[in-house]
UniProtKB/Swiss-Prot annotation:
Keywords: Allosteric enzyme, Glycosyltransferase, GTP-binding, Magnesium, Nucleotide-binding, Transferase. SUPFAM superfamilies: PRTase-like (SSF53271). It comes from Staphylococcus saprophyticus subsp. saprophyticus (strain ATCC 15305 / DSM 20229 / NCIMB 8711 / NCTC 7292 / S-41). This is Uracil phosphoribosyltransferase. HAMAP family: Upp_B (MF_01218_B). Its EC number is 2.4.2.9. The gene is upp. Allosterically activated by GTP. Belongs to the UPRTase family. One of its GO terms (biological process) is UMP salvage. InterPro entries: PRibTrfase_dom, PRTase-like, Upp_B, UPRTase/APRTase, Ura_phspho_trans. Its cofactor is Mg(2+).
Amino acid sequence: MGKVHVFDHPLIQHKLSYIRDVHTGTKEFRELVDEVGMLMAYEVTRDLELQDVEIETPVTKMIAKRLTGKKLAFVPILRAGLGMTQGILTLVPAARIGHVGLYRDPETLEAVEYFVKLPQDIEEREIVVVDPMLATGASAIEAINSLKKRGAKNIRFMCLIAAPEGVEKLQAAHEDVDIFIAALDEKLDNHAYITPGLGDAGDRLFGTK
């Protein structure tokens, strides 16, 4: 069973309080999501493999550490996942970015795929699927299904907030996927919105309704 990591870092929790706040405007909301995305990526990549390399400083030669093993790819779920991407790239500028487009059927609440664009060597990379919210779990499950069908094996999921129902369903559907969350909220309401949540992340990021 994949592990669930809930971050308690003070900076993440501080910024998340403003992301949740209904009075936070679009510009500040975008900036905060971007910043938290970067901070979360720092934690998500904590266990990447390192190798010894010989370098020369201005003073002497030494053995230093550099990343080795599988390369990274981040896959935001459109459209809201895009809001976390720039912060991630600030931290990991060489990472590849794929995209999975999904929308939620308002009646069935099931995720419907409409777009997929991934790096050609996706099966050789460590994948981090990115979406601000894990509500019912349907979008995350379908996105990971799509990645696995195309050969991806090493997959993690990263989100700002999650409902317990979504975490449970994602774990049941993909036992091999670790889940990284800035905050685990109370529940889903009758309309499948996370409570207390932050509203519709996509609408708040892009100024739409």
